[in-house]
């Protein structure tokens, strides 16, 4: 062999061993790493495959009840915290600011128990019929059906159960007043109503003061009746009055009676007056005739049905939900043209996407990426709006830092409505009370206890949090009621107090719906036609029928209930086809006829348990099955439902002939 041949052979030998050593190094590094399983749909504790024992089912629909989330007001946070810590908190419940038991509602509706569903919902959402029309439904954004098709229509189901409850004739009696103490609630918005009901349940006498002639706060004065019919609002508030709420409308604190007098006459006071004044931009022309604030415009449109814009061109400044409400109301009260201008690009607008879509359908013109520069006027009257190009709204860190271009656009108009935010008006209320405002004019309040700087005076709602949602205001009312109860019982406001847990759920894109069976898709809310709804303030959303509601509720996966609902996701996920699931193939049936696990095929990867939306599928302590030789071995339904001790059951645990109590005509998962 020549010298060159020897060199080539040596080079190949060295290269081969280098490859082997490199591979061993990679293998060693991987071996030292922690094994990782798929984090979908929720992160779980990561276990090595050899420490996963045989699978079992904790429960099964038709044999086991779905647990309901219920408790007395002071203990509710503790219940939610316990469920969260033990991974038994349904995402829809955890993502709701008030922790309304949407899962329990869906279960009861699917069972045909709509009145019971209403009573369950009202424990935390004191106005189910109202929120069933206007809530921004964060529960639906956390719904696990987003992974597979579309979320369950929780908000429309709130409305349905409220409508069914209203049809019943029930003997409502006042709640007993057992405490001998009186609490004053100033303001009849959602926060005040929630606190009032909690305090009445605890045995206190509650007196509520409202400066307007009708109760409801911003729900009455600010939400258009095409979204929230006034009879629905007043009917639900009347229900609270029947429970013993002493409601006094037409009484303005600071004018008709002083705040100091209210504090003197009551054992505790809750201030929840909301935000009563619109903010205006400090730009030239903002004092011209024809310039209005959003709240003033909405009050005129809602109360009088005439905001003085008949036949006029209206320009709305703002991109939030209030701005969209103003624009849609302007169309309904006879404006000849309605335009909406905002800083944000179309995909950045802070309003809910469905709100602006409905506004565009009704003829509103959106001018995005435009900043208000000045109001054009002649002889003191509005003749137009000058806009400047807005290049960006937020900086790289996500902070509000708009950048403007040089280009401007003049838009002819007769009326300009500022819908850029609201502020509180507390000057006359706090005089001589010990209540203090900070340098920005905002009431000083302890964020964890709702206590103000005046002893025995608490605050909640938007006067504390700023502009927000109705359900968020309701949540602050619950917390304030808890603090008032502690105060009146002589307890420390913060000691051993459990704050409401705020789980973080991953944001995700909607599932691809191509090929999804139509019976699995969400029941869409029937809507009035755009050409019909712009002529008056009749409701835009028409509501689900009773049958549609039952079918929609049956789509709920009963997440974290530890009860198998027959969704078959485990069988579809299993890479080794070790799971076989069969159920009765009839409309309305949610009972399994077969659940088999072929242990000889199972690779103990854990994907099925991680995929299970209800947390019903879990690993037992039968670790030996995961790494010793496994003969042909199949667990049937009865064995899958055995107890958690690891001992195989010999029978079928009394479920040979499932009664299928969840049959409903025309419903299907």
Can you name each region flagged by the protein language model?
Residues 55-111, 125-154, 192-194, 462, ...:
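Cysteine-centered iron-sulfur cluster-binding motifs in ferredoxin-type domains/subunits
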Residues 326, 460-488:
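A conserved FAD-binding loop/helix module that cradles the flavin
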């Amino acid at each position: 062999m020549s010298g060159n041949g020897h060199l080539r052979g040596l080079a190949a030998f060295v290269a081969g061993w280098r490859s082997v050593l490199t591979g061993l190094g990679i293998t060693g590094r991987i071996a030292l790493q922690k094994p990782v399983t798929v984090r979908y749909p929720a992160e779980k504790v990561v276990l090595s495959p050899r420490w996963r024992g045989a699978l079992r089912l904790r429960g099964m629909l038709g044999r086991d009840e779905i647990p309901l989330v219920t408790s007395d007001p002071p203990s509710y946070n503790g219940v939610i915290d316990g469920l969260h810590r033990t991974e038994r908190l349904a995402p829809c419940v955890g993502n709701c600011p008030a922790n309304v038991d949407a899962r329990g509602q869906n279960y009861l509706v699917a069972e045909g128990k709509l009145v019971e569903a209403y009573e369950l919902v009202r424990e935390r959402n004191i106005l189910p019929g109202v929120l069933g029309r206007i809530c921004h439904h964060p529960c639906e954004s956390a719904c696990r059906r987003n992974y597979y098709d579309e979320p369950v229509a929780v908000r429309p189901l709130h409305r349905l159960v409220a409508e069914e409850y209203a049809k019943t004739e029930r003997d409502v009696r006042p709640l007993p007043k057992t405490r001998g103490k009186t609490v004053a609630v100033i303001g009849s918005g959602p926060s005040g109503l929630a606190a009032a009901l909690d305090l009445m349940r605890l045995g206190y006498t509650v007196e509520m003061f409202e400066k307007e002639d009708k109760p409801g706060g911003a729900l009455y004065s600010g939400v258009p009746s095409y979204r929230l019919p006034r009879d629905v609002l007043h009917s639900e508030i009347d229900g609270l009055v029947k429970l013993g709420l002493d409601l006094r409308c037409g009484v303005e604190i600071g004018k008709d009676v002083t705040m100091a007098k209210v504090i003197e006459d009551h054992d505790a006071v809750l201030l929840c007056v909301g935000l009563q004044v619109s903010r205006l931009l400090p730009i030239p022309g903002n004092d011209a005739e024809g310039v209005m604030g959003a709240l003033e415009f909405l009050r005129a449109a809602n109360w009088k049905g005439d905001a003085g814009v008949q036949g006029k061109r209206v320009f709305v400044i703002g991109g939030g939900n209030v701005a969209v409400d103003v624009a849609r109301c302007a169309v309904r009260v006879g404006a000849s043209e309605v335009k909406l201008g905002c800083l944000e690009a179309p995909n950045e607008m802070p309003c809910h996407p469905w709100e602006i879509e409905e506004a565009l359908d009704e003829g509103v013109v959106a001018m995005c990426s435009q900043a208000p520069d000045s109001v054009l006027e002649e002889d003191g009257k509005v003749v137009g709006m000058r806009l400047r190009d807005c290049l960006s709204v937020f900086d790289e860190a996500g902070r509000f830092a708009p950048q403007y271009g040089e280009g401007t656009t003049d838009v002819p108009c007769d009326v300009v409505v500022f819908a850029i935010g609201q502020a509180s008006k507390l000057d006359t209320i706090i005089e001589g009370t010990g209540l203090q405002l900070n340098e920005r004019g905002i009431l000083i309040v302890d964020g964890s206890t709702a206590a103000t700087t005046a002893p025995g005076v608490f605050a909640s709602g938007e006067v504390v949090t700023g502009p927000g949602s109705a359900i968020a205001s309701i949540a602050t009312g619950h917390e304030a009621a808890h603090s008032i109860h502690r105060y009146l019982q002589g307890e420390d406001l913060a000691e051993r107090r459990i704050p409401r847990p705020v789980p973080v759920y991953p944001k995700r894109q909607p599932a691809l719906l191509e090929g999804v069976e139509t019976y699995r898709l969400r029941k869409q809310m029937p809507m009035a036609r755009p050409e019909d709804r712009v002529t008056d303030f009749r409701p835009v959303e028409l509501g689900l029928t009773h049958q549609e509601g039952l079918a929609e509720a049956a789509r709920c996966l009963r997440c974290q209930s530890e009860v198998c609902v027959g969704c078959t996701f485990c069988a579809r996920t299993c890479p080794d086809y070790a799971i076989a699931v069969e159920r009765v193939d009839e409309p309305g049936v949610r009972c399994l006829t077969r659940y088999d696990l072929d242990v000889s095929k199972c690779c103990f990867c854990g994907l099925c348990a991680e995929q299970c939306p209800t947390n019903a599928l879990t690993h037992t302590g039968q670790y030996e099955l995961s790494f010793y030789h496994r003969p042909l071995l199949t667990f049937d339904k009865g064995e899958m439902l055995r107890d958690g001790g690891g001992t195989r059951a010999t029978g079928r645990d009394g479920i040979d002939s499932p009664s299928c109590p969840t049959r409903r005509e025309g419903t299907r998962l």
